[in-house]
């Protein structure tokens, strides 16, 4: 196993706390492997194997298992005289699992860790049945730093700036970077992940009959990363293509895609009025490779995928991210974490002086002292302009400054 210490260390801080540790995120982002890493960390701390229970519920072994049977199975295995550590992988496969977990937490000396990949594991859903007795960790596909670590297992990476293009193109699903796959092979793997999410986590669970309608919404969303739009925008577009779909249905599909962790909603924030806006949101993909695996590679979309990668990195680091609205124009990202804030503009390259001035003017229009960045992917990505930090996207993704 290739370590992912960012997640493991964050979760280990809550070992033995009276909280269920919940790992969420898109399928194949590495949740199951992180559970195994946590188990190894507990063993290094001296916890014997017999006090560690590990179950993976997407296995046929547990097909048809009821909540009552799960409770009896775990109760019989729990140690009577010492704390037992319980790991439940893809626990959403068991209807009523939350009652089992609640009962064990209340009545037994246990420390419980669970993972899940669909809407029942969203924070908004978990809070309804674990009522304050949990702490959640969203697991994302590999960061750029993790991608470089994985690649070092089978090759010598080029410079980070040179590697960025490959990272954007192949994405960060861990399985893609266990060996040197070709782009075609990598996209086959990613497309299979996409199909599993669409047909298992969305179509089957929600009993969607008109799959073609759902896929049209998916393709529109994937094609418009970095653009603001709404359910009404998609509905009007499909109508122009002679594919009628009402706004309410489009909104419901977007919500289901979000709950399956396939896309992330990024609301607009009015920096002058200091309020979140409810219209014309942006949506970013769980991984850049999803766009290329589903729609094919297009070099004209690299700028949007760079923006997508920056969004994901900010989210990995615990920032709440929104799109900034100012009188001078749009700020790609307003990122907030407790008392910290930063502003980020992302551009693949800036070829005209007027474009460069516009990027800086939007940030200079913000009258506060929080860090402001213009990120580029060309040879001029360095320096400082009136306090605005100019960085290469690759350097920003690896930076410890935020």
Where are these regions (language model features)?
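Pre-Walker A adenine-sensing motif
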Residues: 2-16
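Accessory nucleic acid-recognition modules appended to NTPase machines
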Residues: 182-341
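Interdomain motor-coupling "hinge/lid" segment immediately C-terminal to the ATP-binding subdomain
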Residues: 119, 123-228
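Short glycine-rich substrate-engagement loop in P-loop NTPases that contacts/grips substrate
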Residues: 53-82
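Hydrophobic anchor at the beta1->P-loop junction of P-loop NTPases
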Residues: 23
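Hydrophobic positions on the alpha1 helix immediately C-terminal to the Walker A/P-loop
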Residues: 34, 38
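Conserved lysine of the Walker
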Residues: 31
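Catalytic cores of nucleic-acid endonucleases
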Residues: 324, 348-394
């Amino acid at each position: 196993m290739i370590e992912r210490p960012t997640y493991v260390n964050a979760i280990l801080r809550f070992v033995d706390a009276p909280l269920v540790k919940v790992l969420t995120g898109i399928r194949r982002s590495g949740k199951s492997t992180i559970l195994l890493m946590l188990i190894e960390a507990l063993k290094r701390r001296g916890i014997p194997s017999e006090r560690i229970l590990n179950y993976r519920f997407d296995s046929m072994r547990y097909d048809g298992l009821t909540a009552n049977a799960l409770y009896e199975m775990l109760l019989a295995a729990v140690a009577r005289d010492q704390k037992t550590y319980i790991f439940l992988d893809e626990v959403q496969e068991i209807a009523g699992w939350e009652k089992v977990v609640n009962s064990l937490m209340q009545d037994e000396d246990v420390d419980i860790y669970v993972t899940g990949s669909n809407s029942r594991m969203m924070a908004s859903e978990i809070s309804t049945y674990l009522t304050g007795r949990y702490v959640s960790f969203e697991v994302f596909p590999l960061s750029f730093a993790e991608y470089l670590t994985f690649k070092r297992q089978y090759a010598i990476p080029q410079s980070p700036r040179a590697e960025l293009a490959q990272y954007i193109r192949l994405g960060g699903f861990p399985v893609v970077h266990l060996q040197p796959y070709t782009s075609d092979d990598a996209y086959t793997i990613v497309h299979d992940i996409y199909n599993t999410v669409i047909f298992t986590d969305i179509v089957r669970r929600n009993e969607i009959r008109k799959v073609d309608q759902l896929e049209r919404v998916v393709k529109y969303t994937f094609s418009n990363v970095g653009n603001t739009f709404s359910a009404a925008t998609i509905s009007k577009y499909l109508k122009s293509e002679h594919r009628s779909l009402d706004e309410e249905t489009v909104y419901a599909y977007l919500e289901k895609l979000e709950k399956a962790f396939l896309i992330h909603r990024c609301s607009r924030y009015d920096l002058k009025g200091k309020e979140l806006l409810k219209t014309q949101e942006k949506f970013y993909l769980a991984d850049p490779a999803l766009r290329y695996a589903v729609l094919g590679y297009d070099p004209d979309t690299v700028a949007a995928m760079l923006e997508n990668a920056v969004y994901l990195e900010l989210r990995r680091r615990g920032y709440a991210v929104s799109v900034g609205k100012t009188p001078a124009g749009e700020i790609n990202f307003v990122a907030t974490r407790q008392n910290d804030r930063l502003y980020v503009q992302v551009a693949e390259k800036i070829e005209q002086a007027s474009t460069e001035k516009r990027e800086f003017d939007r940030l200079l229009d913000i009258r506060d002292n929080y860090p402001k960045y213009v990120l580029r992917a060309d040879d001029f990505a360095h320096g400082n302009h009136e306090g605005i930090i100019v960085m290469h996207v690759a350097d920003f993704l690896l930076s410890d400054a935020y």
